[in-house]
């Protein structure tokens, strides 16, 4: 006779050394070392049979530490790359860095004493900037690798490398030779604080900017023929009324523009209230009422006419002795604000410049690099246009009787993105890329690209359709030089194919420092050295957007293992006006095609409340703290890279995304659930040899075949999620599969089969057959996201596998024959009944009628006859059940109860909606000492009097 409690060693409990805790701070670096030592990334590139897949990296700026936006971006890229590797494609990912430009220059200058700065040569500055950039690259590279990002980290692309710079000069050269690059005096965004021109992408428009706006009038000196008869009587006291938010541009005024199609009016000003000297004003007819209240003047309508008729009327400048014309502008002139007549200064505005060109007006911009008025501004010379210069102009207009009103005007105004100070529009000699020359081709190219989300196309299309020519020159020394020389005598630029090729060769060999190191003679081709002229080298460098925008040529086209155009570019949505656009423009200008086939964009990372992150708010989430933990590990535990990666997969990145302590904690819980599920699977397969223990599909019990159907559905949904880049669908599906399908259902039901049966029993091996399929596929499916966890699982597989790494095992594998919608429909119904049974058992448990569910006998009354008969068929102890039980598809196992009855004549309670009524009684018989089920057969075996008939059979190897 066996005594109580001594059966515990006869039960097959799960066995695995796979740790329940992730212990990521120790385990992840070990796994990364395993990948590196076994060269998994390189081996996949060599051995994968599929075609190339090239995701081209948009270069982060080599300045400062990584933030959560960097993590979001790089992890998204890595998820895509790893998925493509698992699908068998050859993936080569070359990370890059943007290393030139003003921000790095400013960092270097900020770290120097002002005395040092005074004596700094361009070459010394470049040397310091290079050192700073390279140190940042090293720091960022280490962090990116810790995120688990795979790539060519030993051979990244840097925009400061000679081979990169030379290819960039090549792009510039081809654009120049096609006639797309020219030098011109044009108004550009000028930053007095940085003393350089800026491109659109280098501007920001902070909230809260208020300008001093003024209404002013200029005296009419002659009338156009079309309005002479109508307006002659008012001419002696007539002024054209304008409105501007930049009074300092009035010294540059050379015209007033009207809209040809708008109606204009002459109004009489009630003299008592007027502070200006004009009795009559010309304004837009639709604005008379609004202006009357804004200016606080009574305005009486005298005559109306079309804007077109005003063309060639002239007026006198209120502050300078010159006459200027009224001209017809474009549809930028509206009655939304102002007076309907626009003060036009061709040296200070884009539209002004275009209109000025049409009328042959000179370009006047009496402002220097520092933002101070020049001698051309007469009495205002030396004053700063954004400060006392603005005030002086307003005062002078008032003194001249020209000012009608001044009022503050809040609006969006461009600031320098680095110095955070306002910019001005100012005409300077610059180098431009003429977008006009290839705009149509660029728009056509946009239409060939797949944009995800689709509205990306609607963002970039109007930007390219409406953008002005691209100012590509910068007055700074840390960058790639524009390879031009100027004739000392005439100032004429010298730039042609021979010059470009010669300079390109020098830079390929020596790097762009050579432009500053070598003499002009050495930089010039032989034929220009002794031709009787003397030249000086240009001092401008290229816009950094031209640097990064040339990466398709410097990297994708130049490296033999890559392929142009790239399959995909993926960056933040701000890059529609940045890198996506500069890359598109250069690629189309040179090759007539887009440099990418697909463009994917993501939003920005906000805190948990949806606020922007800022140091002052104290709501900045540092990716490094998530991975390695903070100073106080109790408050900020080390979660490891996989939790950060899981967060990236959980958000809908097509818009802005949120992150914070609570969200990260949730992610850690989800990873825990996935690990626990995997651990149970590993432990339950400890003694399973797939070669000899696998049960053929046709012989599997219904429950197992249903589970394989679910596995097919789940992993198809996961595949679809990765294919469509909707990783949040992967996150939801896998989490749901682990918790709802496995833990709460299949594994819950399986424990009896796995623990209680004989090791080799059919009911146990059939279950293990399904568990192996679930485990292999779960590891593969999470590998793109939870890369370390997946590899960890793979390294603990208890059975032989031909694949050293999960990434060599390929993608999930499901079979078409597993799909069985009819079976699934019935089992879904069963699962609903199971939920109902569980709820009822819970009520009885709370009433203390039963303890565990095994203490219960469950009676299920089913109203629907067809369903009742199907349930009875799964219940061997129901009268009328003909099939012998397979020890799996029984209701008692499904409900975890000791006995289940399905009466042929059901009874009903009122209010039962689903036609199912459940009763719970205490189970019949005694508790088995081994499986804890209740049975009326406990005690029948003389050898084992304390256990039930199932356990007696199991010990004999028969169950």
Swiss-Prot record:
Its EC number is 6.1.1.5. It comes from the Bacteria. One of its GO terms (cellular component) is cytoplasm. InterPro entries: aa-tRNA-synth_I_CS, aa-tRNA-synth_Ia, Anticodon_Ile_BEm, Ile-tRNA-ligase, Ile-tRNA-ligase_type1, Ile-tRNA_ligase, M/V/L/I-tRNA-synth_anticd-bd, Rossmann-like_a/b/a_fold. It is an enzyme of class 6 (ligase). One of its GO terms (molecular function) is tRNA binding. It is found in: Cytoplasm. Binds 1 zinc ion per subunit. Its cofactor is Zn(2+). A motif ('KMSKS' region) lies at residues 612-616. Zn(2+) binds at residues 928, 931, 948, 951. Keywords: Aminoacyl-tRNA synthetase, ATP-binding, Cytoplasm, Ligase, Metal-binding, Nucleotide-binding, Protein biosynthesis, Zinc. ATP binds at residue 615. It catalyses: tRNA(Ile) + L-isoleucine + ATP = L-isoleucyl-tRNA(Ile) + AMP + diphosphate. A motif ('HIGH' region) lies at residues 60-70. L-isoleucyl-5'-AMP binds at residue 571. GO terms for biological process: isoleucyl-tRNA aminoacylation. Monomer. Catalyzes the attachment of isoleucine to tRNA(Ile). As IleRS can inadvertently accommodate and process structurally similar amino acids such as valine, to avoid such errors it has two additional distinct tRNA(Ile)-dependent editing activities. One activity is designated as 'pretransfer' editing and involves the hydrolysis of activated Val-AMP. The other activity is designated 'posttransfer' editing and involves deacylation of mischarged Val-tRNA(Ile). IleRS has two distinct active sites: one for aminoacylation and one for editing. The misactivated valine is translocated from the active site to the editing site, which sterically excludes the correctly activated isoleucine. The single editing site contains two valyl binding pockets, one specific for each substrate (Val-AMP or Val-tRNA(Ile)). Belongs to the class-I aminoacyl-tRNA synthetase family. IleS type 1 subfamily. This is Isoleucine--tRNA ligase. It comes from Nostoc punctiforme (strain ATCC 29133 / PCC 73102). The gene is ileS.
């Amino acid at each position: 006779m066996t005594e109580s409690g001594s059966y515990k060693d006869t039960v097959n409990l799960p066995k695995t050394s796979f740790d329940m805790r992730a212990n990521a701070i120790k385990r992840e670096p070990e796994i990364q070392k395993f990948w590196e030592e076994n060269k998994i990334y390189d081996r996949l590139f060599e051995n994968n049979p599929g075609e190339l897949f090239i995701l081209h990296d948009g270069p982060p700026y080599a300045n400062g530490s990584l933030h959560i936006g960097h993590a979001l971006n790089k992890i998204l890229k890595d998820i895509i790359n790893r998925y493509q590797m698992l699908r068998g494609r050859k993936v080569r990912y070359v990370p890059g860095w943007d290393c030139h430009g003003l921000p790095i220059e400013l960092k270097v200058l900020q770290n120097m004493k002002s005395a040092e700065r005074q004596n700094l040569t361009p070459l010394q500055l470049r040397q310091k900037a290079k050192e700073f950039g390279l140190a940042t690259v090293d720091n960022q590279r280490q962090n990116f690798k810790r995120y688990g990002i795979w790539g060519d980290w030993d051979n990244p692309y840097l925009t400061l490398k000679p081979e990169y710079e030379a290819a960039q000069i090549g792009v510039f050269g081809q654009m120049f030779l096609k006639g797309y690059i020219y030098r011109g005096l044009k108004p550009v965004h000028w930053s007095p604080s940085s003393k350089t021109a800026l491109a659109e992408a280098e501007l920001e428009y902070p909230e809260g900017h208020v300008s001093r706006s003024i209404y002013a009038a200029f005296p009419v000196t002659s009338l156009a023929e079309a309005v002479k008869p109508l307006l002659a009587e008012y001419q002696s006291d007539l002024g054209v009324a304008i409105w501007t938010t930049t009074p300092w541009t009035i010294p540059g005024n050379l015209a007033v523009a009207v809209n040809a199609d708008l109606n204009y009016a002459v109004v009489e000003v009630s003299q008592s209230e007027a502070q200006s000297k004009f009795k009559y004003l010309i304004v837009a007819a639709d604005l008379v009422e609004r202006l009357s209240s804004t200016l606080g003047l009574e305005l009486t309508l005298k005559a109306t006419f079309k804007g077109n008729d005003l063309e060639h009327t002239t007026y006198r400048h209120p502050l300078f002795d010159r006459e200027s014309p009224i001209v017809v502008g474009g549809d930028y002139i509206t009655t939304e604000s102002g007076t309907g007549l626009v003060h036009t200064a061709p040296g200070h505005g884009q539209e002004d410049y275009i209109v000025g060109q049409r009328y042959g007006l000179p370009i006047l911009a009496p402002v220097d690099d520092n933002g101070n008025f020049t001698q051309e501004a007469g009495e205002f010379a030396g004053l700063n246009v954004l400060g006392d210069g603005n005030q002086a102009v307003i005062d002078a207009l008032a003194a001249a009787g020209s000012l009608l009103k001044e009022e503050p005007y809040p609006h969006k105004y461009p600031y320098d993105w680095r110095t955070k100070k306002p910019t001005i529009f100012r005409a300077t000699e610059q180098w431009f890329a003429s977008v006009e020359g290839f705009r149509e081709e660029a728009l056509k190219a946009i239409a060939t690209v797949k944009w995800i989300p689709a509205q990306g196309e609607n963002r970039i299309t109007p930007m390219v359709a409406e953008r002005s020519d691209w100012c590509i020159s910068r007055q700074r020394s840390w960058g790639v030089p524009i390879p031009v020389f100027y004739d000392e005598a005439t100032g004429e630029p010298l730039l042609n194919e021979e010059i470009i090729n010669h300079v390109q060769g020098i830079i390929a060999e020596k790097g762009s420092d050579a432009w500053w190191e070598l003499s002009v003679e050495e930089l010039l081709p032989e034929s220009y050295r002794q031709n009787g002229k003397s030249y000086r080298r240009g001092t401008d460098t290229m816009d950094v957007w031209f640097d990064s925008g040339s990466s398709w040529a410097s990297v994708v086209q130049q490296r033999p293992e890559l392929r142009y155009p790239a399959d995909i570019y993926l960056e933040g949505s701000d890059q529609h006006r940045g890198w996506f656009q500069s890359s598109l423009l250069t690629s189309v200008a040179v090759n007539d095609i887009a440099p990418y086939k697909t463009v994917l964009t993501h939003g920005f990372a906000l805190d948990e409340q949806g606020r922007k992150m800022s140091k002052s708010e104290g709501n900045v989430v540092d990716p490094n703290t998530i991975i390695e933990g903070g100073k106080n590990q109790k408050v900020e535990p080390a979660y490891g890279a996989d939790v950060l990666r899981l967060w990236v997969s959980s958000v809908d990145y097509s818009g802005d995304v949120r992150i914070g302590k609570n969200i990260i904690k949730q992610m850690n819980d989800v990873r825990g659930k996935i690990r626990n599920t995997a651990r149970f699977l590993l432990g339950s397969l400890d003694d399973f040899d797939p070669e000899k223990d696998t049960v053929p599909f046709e012989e599997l019990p219904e429950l197992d075949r249903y589970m394989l159907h679910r596995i097919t559905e789940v992993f198809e949904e996961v595949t679809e999620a990765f294919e469509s880049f909707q990783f949040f669908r992967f996150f939801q599906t896998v989490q749901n599969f682990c918790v709802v399908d496995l833990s709460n259902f299949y594994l819950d039901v399986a424990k009896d089969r796995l623990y209680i049966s004989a090791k080799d029993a059919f009911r146990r091996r059939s279950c293990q057959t399904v568990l192996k399929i679930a485990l292999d596929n779960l590891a593969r499916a999470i590998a793109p996201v939870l890369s370390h966890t997946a590899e960890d699982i793979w390294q603990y597989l208890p059975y032989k596998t031909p694949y050293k790494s999960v990434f060599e095992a390929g993608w999930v594998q499901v079979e078409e024959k597993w799909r069985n919608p009819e079976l699934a429909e019935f089992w879904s119904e069963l699962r609903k009944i199971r939920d109902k049974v569980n709820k009822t058992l819970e009520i009885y448990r709370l009433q203390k009628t039963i303890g565990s569910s095994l203490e219960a006998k469950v009676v299920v009354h089913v109203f629907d006859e067809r369903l009742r008969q199907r349930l009875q068929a799964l219940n061997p102890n129901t009268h009328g059940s003909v099939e012998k039980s397979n020890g799996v598809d029984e209701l008692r196992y499904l409900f975890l109860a000791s006995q289940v009855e399905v009466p042929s004549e059901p009874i009903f309670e009122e209010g039962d909606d689903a036609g199912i009524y459940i009763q719970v009684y205490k189970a019949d018989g005694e508790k088995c000492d081994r499986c804890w089920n209740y049975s009326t057969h406990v005690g029948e075996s003389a050898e084992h009097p304390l256990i039930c008939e199932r356990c007696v059979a199991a010990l004999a190897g028969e169950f």
